[in-house]
């Protein structure tokens, strides 16, 4: 399997960095480092084979990319929408399909269960979706 080096640089042309809290910067840097280490080196090879790298699902769950705005007690990250946007931006930088996986899991699968499901449904589904043990669909 051929790997590639992630040479992406992210100049702050609009001076957004100075507007971010330390927590937001840490979240962004954590996801950016993950993408550089785990996604960028493998994703082109998977794309050429028309395969999805299944091993990243649990990693994305562990990193908190599934349901980051869902409360912690239900298996989410309990974060704000700025954090969510930064996480998705960094995943997108690595691969659009990876970002789609995370955003569908969090926004189109987990959030509706949290917002409209009953307590039993929240407790049954959200922790396993948040960890990546289960992968939802839309």
Language model features with spans:
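Glycine-rich flavin
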Residues: 26, 33, 38-138
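Intrinsic disorder at enzyme termini
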Residues: 1-23
